[in-house]
Amino acid sequence: MSEFQVPEIPAQFLPKHIALVMDGNGRWATERGMKRTEGHKRGEAVLLDVVDACIELGVPYLSAYAFSTENWRRSTDEVRFLMGFNRDVLRRQRDDLHEKGVRVRWVGRRPRLWRSVIRELETAEELTKDNTTMTLAMCVNYGGRAEIIDAARDIARLAAEGKLRPEQITEKTFPNFLDEPDMPDVDLFLRPSGEKRTSNFLLWQSAYAEMVYQDKLFPDFTQQDLYDAVLEYAKRDRRFGSA
């Protein structure tokens, strides 16, 4: 049972899709004289708490930025740790997620990923494919620009083969070429750590997302922080470009 009070928010004011940038793990560890990897380990439990909070609230879709296409620029040791860590998190948590009715989806590129990571991602997807409580999109080796470029290449290939006409590409049809065509647009873009940028995360899907930035580093993030962000979202007047 959560120690935090779950706010009562009418369904029409709840975000249907939360995009979460799990930022600040390394800084959290460094500030405490620990190895950066210790911050990532702490972040695992925090992510699971966020999943539980989404279930309590009735938020149907959560996307977690686990490893970006830019993270390959980090030190070899940290990249190696993150590959193994993402693999092991899925192995440790998939049964628990399955029992909670969470459907796991992988969003990201295959190239460069360890085969063992791909195997665990695909195993989690297969195990949980029929679950309906909520969807957790694990964004591993993901980049918003890379996703759009890959989609553009697929479209160009089909057009060159005479299978697609330019006028068939619209805002409604373009998402069919993205990594996860069924992913709903992001309603709430949430980033702890005090940084105020999107970091190449779900660029297409976040066109009209409400941004909420919080100062806590991710390992200190609690369910109450998520509730506060959702309460802030519920107060926003979303006009989608209209007056």
Curated annotation (Swiss-Prot):
It comes from Corynebacterium glutamicum (strain ATCC 13032 / DSM 20300 / JCM 1318 / BCRC 11384 / CCUG 27702 / LMG 3730 / NBRC 12168 / NCIMB 10025 / NRRL B-2784 / 534). The keyword Metal-binding applies. This is Isoprenyl transferase 2. PROSITE patterns: UPP_SYNTHASE. Catalyzes the condensation of isopentenyl diphosphate (IPP) with allylic pyrophosphates generating different type of terpenoids. The active site is at 23, 71 (proton acceptor). One of its GO terms (biological process) is polyprenol biosynthetic process. CDD domains: Cis_IPPS. Binds 2 magnesium ions per subunit. One of its GO terms (cellular component) is cytosol. The lineage of its organism: Bacteria, Bacillati, Actinomycetota, Actinomycetes, Mycobacteriales. Its EC number is 2.5.1.-.
